[in-house]
């Protein structure tokens, strides 16, 4: 909304500068709140195109406005007639409001689901040390980029709706509003760059013979977070010095500065499609190679399935709409770009975490361990080495096989088979004594 107000103010200022020196015996050039009219002689009929800012209200704004210069001045036009001539549909306002409200609800739900699923995925990967590896670190950075994207959407909506309600801010174009848009654009670009990092990592894993994951990891961080920083800073400086209009949230097809953001994203998608083809070719060769073990081949296949699915899934919609003007197929663009795009974070979490075999196995292992500790007591440990003050060293190993359903446990008919082995070795001077005890009773502390 601020961009529309500022664009109207800019058109008014240009009109006043253009018509300031015009002297005529007929009608003087002027700005009539809607459009700029040139000077004309009495009896002259003037036809001008609809102002360019009507493109914000309608896809069909290429109409004309007309006035006649009379002895009493310009003929008056009803503002509603002007709106109709310039393609503004008065009957469609309610339907448009309902559509935009539905779109906002749709992408709010999508980003909320993505935010919850991505946060859960990060917690799962962080809690288990067995899942700490370069591959999952890259996944977590990708998760964080989509989390920041969802947060940026919520913050942007809150700020822009406040700006619409307070039209006084439109004249000043607050720095906070622009900062939110800059952060929003950064998060979008970062999500594409980290998807590119996923493709680069998988390609390096398959193609490089001696692949140092730790060495390459810092380069991946530089690409994923540093690359968007450079381009977004360049775009921000360009907007601030050459096109500082409104809150920077309106994207015009004629805005050349917008390509500072579009070009890197398109380049990352193009690189991912090239990697897509190369990975398929290398993967086919490795799977068919007899020197590659079955387990290693399955590992390549599982990682490739997720990455190769995400590359076309996230790239096609951006490429389709990148070269289409913003005012064409607005409804279709909003549905694909906002609603479907808002669920991308959820898809990432499902493919890289929830459907990951290693993650599922680790969750099952922790669940069984928690279930066993809950049955035996909170102080029970699988292995508990202790060192006494007299030099005794004990190692206790507990193995329990439990076959007990909840119903039988409540009926107190649970049968447990417990095998307890206590291995103790005591050293006194030059003598050694070994003792092995087996039983079916509770383990007590040995001192």
Swiss-Prot record:
SS bonds (residue pairs): 15-36, 27-69, 50-86, 177-247
Residues bearing attached sugar chains per UniProt: 17, 22, 64, 91, 169
Transmembrane regions listed in the UniProt entry: 104-128, 136-155, 179-202, 217-238, 257-280, 306-325, 338-357
Pfam families registered for this protein in UniProt: 7tm_2 (PF00002), HRM (PF02793)
InterPro entries: GPCR_2, GPCR_2-like_7TM, GPCR_2_extracell_dom_sf, GPCR_2_extracellular_dom, GPCR_2_secretin-like, GPCR_2_secretin-like_CS, GPCR_2_VIP_rcpt_1
Extracellular side: 1-103, 156-178, 239-256, 326-337
Location(s), subcellular: Cell membrane
Subcellular location, principal: membrane
Keywords: Cell membrane, Disulfide bond, G-protein coupled receptor, Glycoprotein, Membrane, Receptor, Transducer, Transmembrane, Transmembrane helix
Domain of life: Eukaryota
Membrane topology: Multi-pass membrane protein
Cytoplasmic side: 129-135, 203-216, 281-305, 358-447
GO molecular function: G protein-coupled peptide receptor activity; peptide hormone binding; vasoactive intestinal polypeptide receptor activity
GO biological process, one term: adenylate cyclase-modulating G protein-coupled receptor signaling pathway
Annotated Gene Ontology cellular component terms: plasma membrane
Protein family (similarity comment): Belongs to the G-protein coupled receptor 2 family.
PANTHER family reported for this sequence: PDF RECEPTOR-LIKE PROTEIN-RELATED, VASOACTIVE INTESTINAL POLYPEPTIDE RECEPTOR 1
Task of the protein: This is a receptor for VIP. The activity of this receptor is mediated by G proteins which activate adenylyl cyclase.
Protein name: Vasoactive intestinal polypeptide receptor
Gene: vipr1
């Amino acid at each position: 909304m601020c961009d529309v107000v500022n664009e109207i103010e800019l058109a008014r200022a240009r009109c006043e500068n253009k018509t300031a020196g015009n002297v005529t015996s007929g009608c003087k050039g002027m700005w009539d709140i809607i459009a700029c009219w040139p000077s004309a002689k009495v009896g002259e009929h003037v036809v001008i195109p609809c102002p360019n800012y009507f493109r914000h209200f309608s896809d069909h704004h290429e109409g004309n406005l007309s006035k006649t210069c009379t002895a009493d001045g310009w003929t008056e036009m009803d503002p509603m007639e002007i709106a109709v001539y310039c393609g503004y549909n008065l009957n469609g306002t309610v339907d448009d409001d309902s559509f935009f409200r539905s779109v906002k609800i749709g992408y709010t739900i999508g980003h909320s689901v993505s935010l919850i699923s991505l946060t859960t995925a990060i917690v799962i990967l962080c809690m288990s040390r067995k899942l700490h590896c370069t591959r999952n670190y890259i996944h977590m950075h990708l998760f964080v980029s989509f989390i920041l994207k969802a947060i940026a959407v919520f913050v942007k909506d809150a700020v822009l709706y406040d700006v619409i309600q307070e039209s006084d801010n439109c004249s000043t174009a607050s720095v906070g509003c622009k900062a939110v848009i800059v952060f929003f654009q950064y998060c979008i670009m970062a999500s594409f760059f980290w998807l590119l990092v996923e493709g680069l990592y998988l390609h390096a894993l398959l193609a490089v013979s001696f692949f140092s994951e730790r060495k390459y990891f810092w380069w991946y961080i530089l690409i994923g977070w540093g690359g968007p920083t450079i381009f977004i800073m360049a775009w921000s400086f360009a907007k601030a010095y050459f096109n500082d209009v409104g809150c920077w949230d309106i994207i015009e097809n004629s805005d050349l500065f917008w390509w500072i953001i579009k070009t890197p994203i398109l380049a990352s998608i193009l690189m991912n499609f090239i990697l897509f083809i190369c990975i398929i070719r290398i993967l086919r060769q490795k799977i068919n190679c007899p020197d590659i073990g079955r387990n290693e081949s399955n590992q390549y296949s599982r990682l490739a399935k997720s990455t190769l699915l995400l590359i076309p899934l996230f790239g096609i919609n951006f490429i389709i709409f990148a070269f289409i003007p913003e005012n064409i197929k607005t409804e279709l663009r909003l549905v694909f770009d906002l609603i479907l795009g808002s669920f991308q974070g959820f898809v990432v979490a499902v493919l890289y975490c929830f459907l990951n075999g290693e993650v599922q196995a680790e969750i099952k292992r922790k669940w069984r361990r928690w279930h066993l500790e809950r049955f035996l007591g909170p102080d029970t440990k699988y292995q508990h080495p202790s060192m006494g003050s007299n030099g005794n060293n004990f190692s206790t190993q507990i193995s329990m096989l439990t076959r007990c359903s909840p119903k039988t446990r409540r009926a107190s008919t649970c049968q447990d088979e417990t095998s307890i082995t206590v291995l103790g070795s005591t050293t006194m001077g030059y003598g050694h004594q070994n003792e092995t005890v087996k039983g079916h009773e509770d383990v007590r502390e040995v001192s």
